[in-house]
Structures are given as C-alpha cells and as structure tokens.
C-alpha cells in the first residue's frame, strides 16, 4: 500500500530543564550514565525498550551488515547519535546507515545517513512519527525512514520520491502464510536490500490478534482505494 505522508500530533519527550548549547550538550552527555537526545536547547531522556524491540533491531542490523559488508557503508545501532546539523537536534535512532565519506571518521555522531529506522513503542510512537520525523526530513542525504512494529509484522517505509515528496509503502506479514504463498518482501531501496519480512521477527513471539487486525485494516484500506 502506498500513501502520502500524514503528520500526527506529537507530545514532547521528557526534557532536562537546563538550557545548553550544542557543544555543552555533547560534553555533558559524555559524563552521563544514560543516553540523552537534544533539541530546542535541552537534552531529553531516552526510554528503554522491550526484548522484542531490541531483537527486531538486532535482526535488522544483522541483515544490513551481511548485505553491506565491503561496500564502505556503516550500519549503526541505537548507541549512535544522528545530528540533523552540527548544532542539532540530536537523536538516537534504533538503526541507521551512512555511506557518506563525511561520516567516515565520525566519533560522537553522524550527520549524513541515507537510512534511519525506528522500532516503535507505546511511549515514543507519536514522537517517532511526528517531531522526530520532521527533524530527520531536514537531512539532505536521507532517502528512507522506516518504522517497525515489534509486536506484529508491520513495516512502514517512507521513501523520498523524485518529486521531493515522502511516500509510504506499508509491508504487512502474517504467521498464517501458507507454503504456496509468496512471502512479503521488504524493500529498502536506499541500500538496495530486499528480504522477507519474517527475517525481522526471528526469535520473537508475535501476537496473532494484532497481526490479524493489521491485515484486516490493510484489506479495508485497499478496498477503499
């Protein structure tokens, strides 16, 4: 399914009240026991994730590493910051890929990713879909932004088209796929990678109810189109 981008209402994450310059933030965060993003002159606390959340990210990093080995591209996990500009905002996506020479020697953060991935959670979904995506869209090298549901086989891929517009392709899988059906293939065009959606959910027990609801919603929207 392909749809035009829609921006949801976005609550702000928990912020640190102290105002800091970008340089002060980068120095301050090095001394903290936890990770903090940065926007609007303030640091904000990063929330933890569930085991399925982490497993999905690990599975994707494994797929990307195997595919990109020897290409000169870097696959980075949730410990790597992305700077929208050298002065921020700064966010920690779950997975990112950069193939840009300017990121080759980066130490504290990258600035030129082609692919950014967020694994959704109840506490961050609105932020990931809203304000954070608006920030990411300012990165001129970004070609794809991907949102993955860790509790059901659902991958939303936003791609920048030739007209400079972001379009959504929604991939939905099911545990009930029969042996004669073709598996749903997720396409990440920014890194020229295609893989079955099931590969993202290896070693994860999914909710059959949520998967069924997603499929019914997708069929309903397809029929309306």
Outline where the language-model segments fall.
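Gly/Pro/Ser/Thr-rich low-complexity, intrinsically disordered segments predominantly at protein N-termini
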Residues: 1-225
């Amino acid at each position: 399914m392909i749809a035009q981008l829609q921006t949801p209402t976005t609550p702000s994450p928990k912020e640190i009240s102290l105002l800091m310059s970008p340089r002060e933030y980068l120095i301050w965060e090095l001394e903290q026991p936890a990770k903090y993003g940065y926007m609007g002159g303030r640091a904000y606390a990063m929330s933890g994730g569930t085991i399925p959340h982490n497993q999905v990210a690990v599975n994707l990093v494994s797929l990307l590493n195997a595919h990109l080995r020897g290409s000169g591209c870097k696959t980075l996990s949730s410990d790597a910051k992305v700077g929208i500009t050298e002065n921020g905002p700064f966010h920690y996506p779950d997975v990112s890929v950069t193939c840009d020479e300017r990121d080759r020697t980066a130490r504290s953060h990258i600035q030129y990713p082609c692919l950014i991935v967020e694994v959704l959670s109840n506490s961050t979904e609105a932020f990931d879909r809203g304000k954070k995506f608006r920030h990411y869209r300012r990165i001129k090298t970004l070609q794809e932004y991907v949102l993955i549901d860790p509790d059901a086989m659902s991958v939303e891929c936003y791609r920048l088209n030739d007209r400079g517009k972001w379009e959504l392709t929604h991939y939905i899988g099911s545990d009930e796929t029969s042996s004669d059906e073709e598996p749903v293939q997720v396409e990440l065009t920014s890194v020229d990678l295609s893989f079955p959606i099931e590969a993202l959910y290896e070693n994860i027990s999914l909710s059959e109810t949520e998967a069924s609801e997603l499929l019914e919603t997708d069929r309903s929207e397809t029929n309306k189109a």
